[in-house]
Each structure stands twice: as C-alpha cells, then as structure tokens.
Amino acid sequence: MGSLTGRVVVVTGASRGIGKGMALALGAEGAFVYVTGRTTTPGSHPLPGTVGETAAEITRRGGTGVAVAVDHANDAQVAVLFDQVRQEQGRLDILVNNAFSIPEDLTEPRPFWEKPLSNWEMVDVGVRSNFTAAWHAAKIMVPQKSGLIVAISGYVGVTYTYGVVFGTCKSAVDRMARDMAVELQPHNIASLSLWQGLTFTERANRNLARNPEMKKLTVTNPLIGCSPEFPGRVIAALAMDPDIMRRSGGTFITAEVAQDYGVTDVDGKVIPSLRAERGAPIWRPIA
C-alpha cells in the first residue's frame, strides 16, 4: 500500500512533460489521480503523449488514473472537471497546478517585440488557469479543512530566462501561491510554489537534440537536470508531512525540499540546488 493510498489528486497539464511525470509519481504512491490535458488522440500533438496514456500508466503503477479532457483556457471545462471530482470522490487532497501554454518560439533568443503578441497566452494558461483551478479546488478543500495546492514554477521567477512573458508568469504564480496561503491558512490548507530546474521532458529532450552545446553540458555535468517524476516524488513527501502548514506560503527550490525529506530522483541521484547559480526564492512561508 502506497503512502498516498486514499488521497485524491488533480494534476493539470499531464498529457506529457512534468505534469505526466508528477502524476505518475503520485500514482505510484497509491493516489487516485485525475489528469487533465487537451491531447486525447495519439499523434495529434507534435510531441508524444495523451491524457489517456498517462492515466493508464498511473493505474499500471498501482494508483488509479482518470483522464479528463480539459482546455484550461475554458472556464466551463474546468468547472466540469471539479464537479466530477466532487461527485465521484467527495473530497480533494492535492491540486498540482502545472498546465502551461508553451509557445514554439519560447526558447528563441529574440526580444519580446520580435515575438508574437500571442505569447501573452502563457498568462492565460499558466497564471489565470492556476487561479481558476485553485478557486474550484478551495470550494472542495475548505469544508474538509485540509488540502495542499502546489504551483509549479522555476528559477525564472527571479532570473531572466526565455523572455519577458515567461518570467512574468512564474513570478506571478509564486506570489499567487503566497497570497492564497494567507487566505487558506484558517482552513488548514497549504499553498506553496516549487521551483524546477532543467527537467528531461519530451520537449526538453527534443530541444537538447537541436542544441549540441547544451546537450554537451548535460553530458559533462551529469548532475544537471532531473526526470519529470522527481517533483512528483517531492510533492508526495510534502503531502505526507504532518507539519506541512509550516511551509505554506513559501516558494521552494524542489531540490532543496527533496534533500529535507531524503527524496532522490528515480535513478537514486541527489538533485542539486542551483540557488547559487540561478537565484533564491523571494517568498518565505507565512507561518
């Protein structure tokens, strides 16, 4: 029996990438995991993965996976998701806000005025979507007087990376997690933000293949980067912490939280913090 058996989880944006990895890690601990995403048909996205495939793998690993097709820019679809969770489970223990609209030109070294104005859609699905999902989740969590809401962010919150909109989004979700914590504290619900570094997702692996110099860096320094499941393993540890409220409102480097709990990556590797190289979080816990 896993450490999260009986826990109900929603992971947004889990067709592939970090979202899929986190969902698999939480499912491997026995959780009942609702996974959301827009990709339902194999081959309909340039990168592999569907929500159905993620859900099926969760179940194979010992959890229970349920795929729900959701466009997180569509408020009505998000409402249906949380209605389904409420009706089927009657509770929600963990919300992982991961859905993010990633433009194809995100990593291109061009200034903001030379990129499409549509890149602002990262704010719609990346900031507003976090708020919308948390708004619905809180309506389930507050009556039960428990819950954990996790935002997925990164060092980009304080260090310039990939342009103006990307940094704006991640800074915003860090602050949102803190202010939500203030309002959720009386209800015993924790809200926090986790900073990820390089994660070997399908997209990252494709980009590394196109950038030999960056790929060489990961080979010469094997400690750089982690699997998509690593943050999910950390979230599982957070969820099992009986004193989780002491962290509420804070922004944390995932690697440092992992070291606090003795969590390693799937291959046993200890992921290092990049605090010295990339910067430190601004927001401390409110407690």
Model-derived regions, located:
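A short, exposed helix-loop element centered on a Lys and neighboring polar residues
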Residues: A134-W135, R178
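Rossmann-fold scaffold of SDR-type NAD(P)-dependent oxidoreductases
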Residues: T12, L92-E104, G126, A151, ...
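C-terminal helical subdomain
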Residues: S193, E213-A287
